[in-house]
């Protein structure tokens, strides 16, 4: 299984991926986890990834552009794309069993008040 994790904090993913059962699965070639830093795909000199919501409202959301570009970098075609958010489906045993059958996953870690809805509508499974 190959898992690409799109995140603003890749330094948090790498130690977890190397520890315990995940680490053993990686060493045995069963699992490959790659952390992708969304900030690497911003088009401004300050590596800014947040913006105000398009329709207005409180808080900031992750800008669609760097997330779209990060997703393109992992060749997400034929990969199931998950967005981790408290608004979505609960991650329970049934969902984990379903996901374990996938060959390739992309996990997008949310931040701020969420992510631009345009990205969710176009890309998330």
For the regions a language model picked out, list residue spans one by one.
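S-adenosyl-L-methionine/SAH cofactor-binding core of RNA-modifying enzymes
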Residues: 61-111, 116-117
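Generic recognition of short, well-ordered alpha-helical segments
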Residues: 16-20, 94, 118
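Short, solvent-exposed amphipathic alpha-helical segments in soluble enzyme
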Residues: 20-24, 97-100, 122-123
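Conserved beta-strand scaffold positions in the cores of enzyme catalytic domains, especially
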Residues: 33-35, 81-83, 125
């Amino acid at each position: 299984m190959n898992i690409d994790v799109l995140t603003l904090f890749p330094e948090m993913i790498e130690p977890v991926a190397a520890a315990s059962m995940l680490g053993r699965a990686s060493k045995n070639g069963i699992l490959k986890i790659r952390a992708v830093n969304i900030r690497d795909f911003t088009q401004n000199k300050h590596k800014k990834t947040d913006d105000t919501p398009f329709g207005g409202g409180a808080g900031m959301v992750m800008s669609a552009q760097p997330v779209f570009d990060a997703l393109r970098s992992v060749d997400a075609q034929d990969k199931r794309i998950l967005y981790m958010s408290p608004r979505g489906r609960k991650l329970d045993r049934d969902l984990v069993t379903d996901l374990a059958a996938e060959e390739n996953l992309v996990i997008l870690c949310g931040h701020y008040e969420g992510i631009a809805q345009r990205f969710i509508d176009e890309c998330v499974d």
